[in-house]
Amino acid sequence: SDVKEFLNKLRDHCTKKGVLLIFDEIMTGFRLSSRGGAGLFQITPDLVTYGKVLGGGFPIGAVGGKKHIMETKHVFYGGTFSANPLSMYAAKLILEAIINETYIKYDQLDTAGQTFRDELNNYFILHDKKIRAIGCGSINRIIFTDRFIMNRKDRDLYEPTNAQSMFSESLRDHNVFVNGNGLYHFSMSHTSEVIRKLIGNIKRIC
């Protein structure tokens, strides 16, 4: 893909120049794969940040990296939520579930996301709607343009200003709450029945 090609070039360039490649995987970490976006695109960063999924709903943030970098210099960092026992225990259980594949099934999440996007896009194209479902793995978004977009700048350029907020309000009228950022993050709790109901509501609104 274009993204994978870009990341590979970025990895090569950073290596040649002696610059650390840092991935922000706060959103994508443990969502796109057990190694996040780095695993999905088969790129090894030097440092990576994690959050959200890692805490299983509790506040958390973590930094990981290659051993020789992490051991270069020890840093003391204190904060209100630092090393919170409940968050740490939740993270332990999450990591165990990912490593042992006891609960989180990435192939199932990927299939759910792809089905969501394919079915909606087929509907939008069939009915000549300037709307598309985009995303990667279990991360999805509805965009109100049929133009190809690669980033936030493209979306802001092609998508009507109030489209997302109006759409979210309409979904709430159908008892569907979408996060303020407009992203649909599917989890193992979202059954096929729940996703089909979501697809049906989106079709009715659009």
Predicted regions and their residues:
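Conserved N-terminal phosphate-binding loop of PLP-dependent enzymes in the Aspartate aminotransferase
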Residues: 1-206
